[in-house]
């Protein structure tokens, strides 16, 4: 399973360029202008001009913010250059370099170098690096879990994630809390009570992936007493927030409960997501793992195909059904095969 890096934690002093600008209004007179008519490109250009002025005056934070703006715009080569110039002066730049080298953003992928940068953050005694330590620990745990840049070790990954999760602290790495939930529910032997605990902590701290996972644990009584009402509450809320895996599982629930009209309407919307462009976009917006997004799409595609094949809640159309069956197989062959096996045994 391919995991994703923890996003840069907010700086306790300046969480964003706009907050920085508000603290430096004399230098950022454009804040008084009406910018509603500006395009995104105009605003980015304006911000870069103003940051350049601050840099010329020796403002090192402005230098980092310019690199971060490049990063957020997807201009990774420019961001890498900015961060490398100030890595010895700015811990946030060091953190971002770790992410960029590990994930191969703006440079050739170099997991070892990415790991070294994260260790540098974790081992730093500087107070200015404190807000980055939990996120760095999560990323190091990911490296040990994936065996990239270091020798693979689930035990070391678990240790680092437990540190990063900090007993459910909302200011720690919520991503680590969610990952612990996933880890304990997939390791052998499974530790479902621990999985439920960590998904609960992460969900309480706003994690969308864990909210969907909690719904499934309630639905099937995994690590907690079965509670359909609580399950549907979690799944529906997660689905509304954009969790595609939760959406796919709701499709399955509606089908099994014979709510075919509802199943068809909901499944079509999910099944019609573009598998090439929508998955990475949804992953970026929701911070859900691409593997679970594609799994949710595959579930929706399969059940939509089944409804079309049998004419359940929709006019029968076997040709279109074949299209959606094929899409389910492309998205997740193992899941499609599992559902097909249930179909053959007349359990669907």
From Swiss-Prot:
Sel1-like repeats lie at residues 94-126, 134-169, 174-207, 208-243, 244-278, 298-333. Its main location: cytoplasm. The keyword Hydrolase does not apply. SMART domains: SEL1 (SM00671). Pfam families: Sel1 (PF08238). TPR repeats lie at residues 60-93. InterPro entries: LRP2-binding, Sel1-like, TPR-like_helical_dom_sf, TPR_rpt. One of its GO terms (cellular component) is cytoplasm. Keywords: Cytoplasm, Repeat, TPR repeat. Interacts with LRP2. May act as an adapter that regulates LRP2 function. This is LRP2-binding protein.
């Amino acid at each position: 399973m391919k995991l994703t890096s923890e996003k840069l934690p907010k700086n306790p002093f300046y969480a964003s360029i706009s907050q920085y600008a508000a603290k430096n209004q004399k230098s950022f007179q454009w804040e008084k202008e009406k910018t509603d008519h500006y395009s995104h490109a105009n605003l980015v250009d304006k911000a870069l001009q103003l940051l350049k002025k601050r840099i010329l005056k020796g403002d090192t934070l402005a230098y980092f913010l310019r690199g971060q703006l490049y990063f957020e715009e997807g201009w990774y080569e420019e961001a890498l250059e900015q961060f490398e110039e100030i890595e010895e002066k700015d811990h946030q730049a060091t953190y971002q370099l770790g992410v960029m080298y590990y994930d191969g953003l703006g440079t050739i992928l170099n997991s070892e170098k990415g790991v070294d940068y994260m260790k540098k953050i974790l081992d730093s005694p500087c107070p200015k690096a404190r807000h980055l330590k939990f996120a760095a620990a999560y990323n190091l745990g990911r490296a040990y879990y994936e065996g990239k840049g270091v020798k693979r070790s689930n035990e070391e990954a678990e240790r680092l994630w437990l540190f990063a999760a900090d007993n459910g602290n909302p200011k720690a790495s919520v991503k680590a809390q969610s990952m612990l939930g996933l880890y304990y529910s997939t390791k052998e032997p499974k530790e479902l009570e621990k999985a439920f605990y960590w998904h609960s902590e992460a969900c309480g701290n706003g994690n969308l992936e864990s909210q969907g996972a909690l719904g499934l644990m309630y639905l099937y009584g995994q690590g907690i007493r079965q509670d359909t009402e609580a399950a549907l509450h979690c799944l529906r809320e997660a689905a509304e927030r954009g969790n595609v895996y939760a959406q796919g599982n709701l499709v399955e629930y509606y089908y099994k409960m014979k709510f075919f009209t509802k199943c068809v309407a909901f499944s079509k919307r999910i099944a019609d997501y573009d598998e090439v462009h929508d998955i990475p976009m949804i992953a970026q917006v929701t911070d859900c793992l691409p593997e679970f997004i594609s799994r949710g799409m595959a579930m929706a595609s399969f059940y939509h195909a089944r409804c079309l094949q049998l004419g359940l809640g929709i006019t029968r159309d076997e040709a279109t059904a074949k299209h959606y069956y094929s899409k389910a197989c492309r998205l997740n062959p193992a899941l499609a095969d599992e559902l097909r096996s249930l179909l053959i045994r007349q359990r669907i």
